[in-house]
Amino acid sequence: MSYRELVAELPREHAEALSDALVELGALSVSVEDADADTPDEQPLFGEPGLVPERTAWQHSRVIALVDATQDPAVLLAAAANEAGLAQAPRFELREVEEQDWVRLTQSQFEPIHIGEKIWVVPSWHDAPQPDALVLELDPGLAFGTGSHPTTRLCMEWLEQTVQPGQTVLDYGCGSGILAILAKKCGAGRVTGIDIDPQAVEAARHNSERNRADVTYGLPDDCPDGEFDIVVANILSNPLKLMASMLASKVKPGGRIALSGVLARQADEVASVYARYIDIAVWREHEGWVCLAGTRRESH
């Protein structure tokens, strides 16, 4: 079966309605992009968690619908525009989509990732290249964290060097569960992963089962009382600052904490918030992102 992309540009107030109508009328997929991307008029859409976004749609949007090549694009777009309440259908262009083995193409884009000394993040269709590797089998999915992002990589390198056998570990903002799973494979004892997203929690549980890693996952209200030998939080700078007191309280006196999701220019500000609880500093920087790490003082 062959496909084409139907591409239309229109104001933000119509983009979502047209997208929904295209899906209802048989488009195989629909995406919305900033039509001004990579120009001086490009508009960042979302800010960090904890901040109210300035806008929820791009002023000038590009709607891209993947359609069966047998469909008449003009008829489809006219019907979608009518369904969406537009006065008339927007102008559009068609792009031919080359026939592909989509499964093979997707798999080829995700090769094993080597991190630290012995860590390999390996999709299920690959074998680990290193016989004595710490292997995490993880396929791309809904939850953040496959080892490709600099912040995930930094936290994994830190855990590989830090975790000692039997230590308790809290992964706050666990996403795919990759850090919690790694901690367990590094010999940790009780490991807990917490995330605000129920989908992430389910994905993390699935990934732990595949990796035969005994990790307990839950939402923030499920976070156990008590302290941990190690706390790792790969989130973003604003929520890290807002949760400083809580996260610091989860670290045992003398225990270790690592924070990432922090840009290099944000490091001093985040570190200053944690300084009242933790002796903390930049541990390592990679591609403009940093991992802050430190030890909780015996009393605070």
Curated annotation (Swiss-Prot):
Free-text function comment from the UniProt entry: Methylates ribosomal protein L11.
UniProt-annotated location(s): Cytoplasm
CDD domains, sorted: AdoMet_MTases
Family that this chain belongs to: Belongs to the methyltransferase superfamily. PrmA family.
Annotated S-adenosyl-L-methionine binding sites: 152, 173, 195, 234
SUPFAM superfamilies recorded: S-adenosyl-L-methionine-dependent methyltransferases
EC numbers for this chain: 2.1.1.-
GO cellular component: cytosol
Name of the featured protein: Ribosomal protein L11 methyltransferase
InterPro entries xref list: Ribosomal_L11_MeTrfase_PrmA (IPR050078), Ribosomal_PrmA_MeTrfase (IPR004498), SAM-dependent_MTases_sf (IPR029063)
Catalytically driven reaction(s): L-lysyl-[protein] + 3 S-adenosyl-L-methionine = N(6),N(6),N(6)-trimethyl-L-lysyl-[protein] + 3 S-adenosyl-L-homocysteine + 3 H(+)
GO biological process, one term: methylation
Keywords: Cytoplasm, Methyltransferase, S-adenosyl-L-methionine, Transferase
Broad class of where this protein is predominantly found: cytoplasm
Enzyme class: transferase
Listed GO MF terms: protein-lysine N-methyltransferase activity
Top-level taxonomic group: Bacteria
